[in-house]
Amino acid sequence: MIDIGLSKMALIGAVALIVIGPEKLPRVARTVGTLLGKAQRYVADVKAEVNRSMELDELRKMKDTVENAARDVEQTIHTSASDFQKDMEHSLGDASATGSTYGVDQGLSTVVPAYKHPAKNWRLKRGAMPQWYKARAGVRTRVQSGAARVARFRPQKFH
């Protein structure tokens, strides 16, 4: 930026004091300070905008390279698929020409059955647990009411 030393600033201050006068100098100094602050903020905003545009350009270039790579992969997949399809048609044509019926009579259907989520039976899963594990884990296998438990464990009366 501008190289202003202490001696130059003192000279500028003395000239301003003589030209402007002591009563208007504080107001002029405040105005100059606010204008310098605005100029610094404007320069900082311009620098930020330039940096942002440079980053956007880099991102655009990166996006273009990724899109080109994706197109190349897609093209490779399409060529491989078409080569595979041509080979299959060629081999099926050879098989039908030689009299082989494998694959021709079967129809090579491409019908794939729909996926059905297996229903979980939690009772079966619970029953598949070993008995010794149930006893250790405190799993109740025979649930009784409170009165039935008392009657079961009540000592017998002797007559």
From Swiss-Prot:
A single Gene Ontology CC annotation of this entry is:
TAT protein transport complex
List, alphabetically, the Pfam families matched.
Answer: TatA_B_E
Q: Does the keyword Protein transport apply?
A: yes
TM spans, by residue? Answer: 1-21
Q: Which GO terms describe its molecular function?
A: protein transmembrane transporter activity
Q: Which InterPro entries match?
A: TatA/B/E, TatB
Q: What is this protein called?
A: Sec-independent protein translocase protein TatB
